[in-house]
Amino acid sequence: VVSFPFEDIYIDRRHVLHTLPKREQKIVFYFALLTASLGIGGIRAIVCPLSAYNLEDCGPKELLSFFNWFYWLVNLNSAVVFVSISYIQQSVARNLGFLIPFVSGIMAIITIHMMRGEMIYKPKAESSLLTTFGVIGSALRTRCVRHRYLSAGVTNWLDHAKENHGGQYSEIQVESTKSLTRLFPLFTFQILYRTCVMQIPSGYYLQTMNSNLHFSGFVFPIAAMNVISIVPLLILVPVLECINSSCLFSSKDTGHSPTIYIVVGHLSAALSVMVAGFSEIHRKHFPQVEQTLSEEVLLVSSMPCFHLAPQYILLGVAEALVTPSCALLSFRLVPERIRGISMHFLALFNGAGCFMGAFFVQTAHAGTQGNWFPHLLHEGKLERFFFFLASLMMVNTLGFWTIAHRYNKLHEDYTSEFRGSLSGEKLLKHGKAVKHYDSVLESSPIFSPMK
């Protein structure tokens, strides 16, 4: 209830304003943002690898299908939340709008606690995040100290961390880290894409707030515009399932990689931001009218907010194409022991994109003295900011397209790339196979021992 200390939260039934100093309001506000970010970041990074444990032996087609429907369910829940809670906050009571997520969070914690035995069943893996950073640090340190003597027989700079090259980590740990670092270019190109997605709660939000929200006597909630970006994802997932079966994974040799989805999704995001720029120019051509929002009278454009729907739709199409494909590549292109770490890095770079979006907004506001990102949209040139971001996104798309071929080999077994020299692991797997074969012979009377 006190997460976001707006004034109407502190009005009781007698309409008496509860005095809370601005300093305390800021403390509560930033503390709430910190706890929310920690919770959301942890859930988004951990839940998906836990759910995908049952699919570790499946191929890329089944994995992409899983991630498609996983994010489909997530966005279906988001659509319900945006429609219901946003209406309650804007038209009924903002206090109740904050209380509902609080109660839902408590129920989710109780449910996870009750089901923890079913969710956490994987033994501790050999590789951890500290091991990954340790391999990178050891390689850099060894390379700097003994560069003259070790550079001749090393094909990759991370090989300096191997024990036979003067490092302190085994070959399996180093090779796992190498497979993870190959994904860093993929993660890096998602930063600017995530910056475009973050325009929904920033630039797109301001556009909607400064447009006509009245529709047949009903005030349309601003947050409900997010549903327009979710609807394309809910529609496209079943269509993409058919495309995946018929074209994308038709065969190991002639099929295409999901990187084509990422390229098309990045193009859709760039078009979305470009359309937002043209929509801003179009919005200014309408006369201004007064509109009451949260008990404040604002001068807004008389353009209906639904004219902004195309930019939301394009961004929804981008999310439907990019997010599941990136999750598939992050999960499939690394060995089993570090798949959770790979998903965590994907979430980390997505978070970096959110910070990049905030940085762009602050820089545009300060660098242009409020002209590119103004407080009052009719007095500034917000469209220039959108066109600048769209041009950056186009360059980002071309950059990813040039390296997309690196992530096409989804049918390779990345756990066997470096298994040839690991005799211990081979013997362990051979022992398991012998035990399984012996158990089959003992339990099946139709088999007779070979002489």
Predicted segments, located by residue:
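Hydrophobic transmembrane alpha-helices of multi-pass solute transporters/permeases
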Residues: 1-451
